């Protein structure tokens, strides 16, 4: 999934730097990914640690992490179920009605054919769940598979803040349900959909990885359509882009981010805390260092990487094609 702030290309670097600090044998450690997004970092550590705790306030993220982190055993008849979903006749449901041109919505997030296919698949998954034909693990596996497939054929410039006037090449391809595969192993991992500053008061562990929003862009707005597919609830889309109501993170606010971040660190019951942030974030390196040094031993490592695709396609007028990713490190002592 093409995702703002995705750590896919940085995951090996992150694993190395975290292991250099917390130890290379992590089998007895509890690892928490508090702003999990698509779960890339938690997935990297899933088979190497005792337990992963994954959290994000967005429901689409919960669905993805409930599958990639929460699921640990093979899904029975996964191939058969996906084949049946692929063969469903199209249905004119919520996605077609609100986000496809053919419905008269004046929005074009998907081709008419893909919108109807998404509806058919989403409705069937819910029916299987409600009739107990599938269990909870299978439900989230199928939902995650649908979200991944829908994202690949979305007619957007990487995020869902707006749709493109004409269907791009990838949006013309038919929806395909490629299984959202996850690592098999021991269970006991935990997945939450909660406010990070509230959840941190009720969990504890060894390694806390933080990847909060860097800037003013709200994930609930940028990925509203993934929430709509995941929730598939009755709502009224607003405006030209069809936004739904969404939660706003204080980590996207210049005036709020420092106090909420300091409160988070204060309440964290973890020995090692790692913060991913970049050189264009709302908090400066100095501000983060000042907060971390109040609670223990501080260090900083960094690496250069290429800018997220949407930054280059949405007329953001950035001067540089790359940014610096900072990994702030705290060994908490008080």
UniProtKB/Swiss-Prot annotation:
It comes from the Bacteria. PROSITE patterns: N6_MTASE (PS00092). The keyword Oxidoreductase does not apply. GO terms for biological process: DNA restriction-modification system; methylation. Belongs to the N(4)/N(6)-methyltransferase family. Keywords: DNA-binding, Methyltransferase, Restriction system, S-adenosyl-L-methionine, Transferase. It catalyses: a 2'-deoxyadenosine in DNA + S-adenosyl-L-methionine = an N(6)-methyl-2'-deoxyadenosine in DNA + S-adenosyl-L-homocysteine + H(+). Its EC number is 2.1.1.72. GO terms for molecular function: DNA binding; site-specific DNA-methyltransferase (adenine-specific) activity. This is Type II methyltransferase M.NlaIII. Coiled coil: none annotated. The gene is nlaIIIM.
């Amino acid at each position: 999934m093409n995702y703002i702030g995705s750590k896919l290309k940085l995951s090996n670097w992150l694993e190395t730097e975290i292991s250099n600090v917390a130890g290379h044998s992590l089998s007895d450690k509890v690892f928490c990914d508090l702003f999990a997004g698509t779960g890339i970092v938690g997935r990297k550590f899933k088979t190497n640690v005792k337990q992963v705790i994954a959290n994000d306030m967005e429901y689409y993220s919960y669905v993805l992490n409930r599958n990639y982190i929460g699921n640990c055993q093979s899904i029975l008849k996964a191939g058969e179920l996906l084949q049946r979903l692929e063969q469903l006749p199209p249905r004119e449901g919520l996605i077609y009605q609100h986000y496809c041109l053919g419905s008269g919505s004046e929005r074009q997030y998907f081709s008419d054919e893909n919108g109807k296919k998404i509806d058919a698949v989403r409705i069937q998954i819910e029916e299987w769940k409600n009739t107990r034909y599938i269990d909870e693990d299978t439900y989230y596996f199928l939902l995650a598979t649908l979200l991944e497939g829908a994202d690949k054929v979305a007619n957007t410039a990487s995020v869902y803040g707006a749709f493109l006037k004409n269907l791009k090449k990838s949006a013309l391809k038919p929806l395909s349900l490629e299984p959202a595969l996850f690592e098999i192993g021991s269970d006991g991992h935990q997945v939450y959909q909660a406010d990070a500053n509230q959840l941190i008061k009720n969990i504890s562990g060894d390694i806390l990885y933080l990847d909060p929003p860097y800037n003013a862009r709200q994930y609930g707005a940028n990925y509203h359509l993934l929430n709509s597919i995941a929730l598939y609830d009755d709502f009224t889309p607003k405006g030209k882009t069809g936004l739904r109501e969404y939660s706003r993170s204080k980590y996207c606010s210049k005036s709020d981010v420092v106090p909420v971040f300091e409160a988070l660190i204060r309440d964290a019951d973890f020995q090692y805390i790692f913060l991913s942030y970049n050189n264009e974030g709302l908090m400066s390196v100095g501000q983060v260092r000042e907060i971390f040094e109040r609670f223990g031993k501080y260090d900083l490592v960094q690496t250069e990487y290429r800018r997220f695709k949407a930054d280059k396609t949405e007329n953001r007028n950035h001067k540089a094609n790359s940014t610096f990713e900072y990994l702030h490190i705290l060994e908490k002592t008080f």
